[in-house]
Amino acid sequence: MASRKATVQSIVESFNERDIDKMTAPVSKNFVYQLLPKSLERGPMDVAGFRGLFEATKSYFNNFKFEVVDTFEDSAADKMILWANVTSDTHVGKFATEVMLIFYFDTTGKIYKWIEWIDSAVGKEFEQKLQGQ
């Protein structure tokens, strides 16, 4: 079983490589992804929904960079938290934001829950730029 740190490092690499197969390799069969805050009105997704969201937005981003600022591991709760800066070139200009990812691990080392907090103001502004082009 890979360590939680190694698993999360693999996910960071998969973001930068834009590789959804690598990104979802360590998730469990009962995986749930949640994009927050709730004001975005995005419901929980299973792995198929997560893959669909990734594939639908993948083409917007070029020179994608996911850079970890800090991590926190709670061994007792089988949880890791990641704070990162994200930058990318897009056809509507430079994109830059911060994200917080929370990964919940089961007893086999698989991720069963992934919560992603995004800067909703940046996300909404980016959506408006995409719609206005």
Curated annotation (Swiss-Prot):
InterPro entries: Fungal_Meroterpenoid_Isomerase, NTF2-like_dom_sf. This is Core atranone cluster (CAC) protein 11. Signal peptide: none annotated. PANTHER family: AUSTINOID BIOSYNTHESIS CLUSTERS PROTEIN F-RELATED, AUSTINOL SYNTHESIS PROTEIN F-RELATED. Part of the core atranone cluster (CAC) which products are predicted to catalyze most or all steps of mycotoxin atranone synthesis, starting from geranylgeranyl pyrophosphate (GGPP). The initial cyclization of GGPP to dolabellane is probably performed by the terpene cyclase ATR13. The Baeyer-Villiger oxidation near the end of the atranone synthesis, which converts atranones D and E to atranones F and G is predicted to be catalyzed by the monooxygenase ATR8. Of the CAC's other predicted gene products, the reducing PKS ATR6 might synthesize a polyketide chain. It comes from the Eukaryota. Pathway: Mycotoxin biosynthesis.
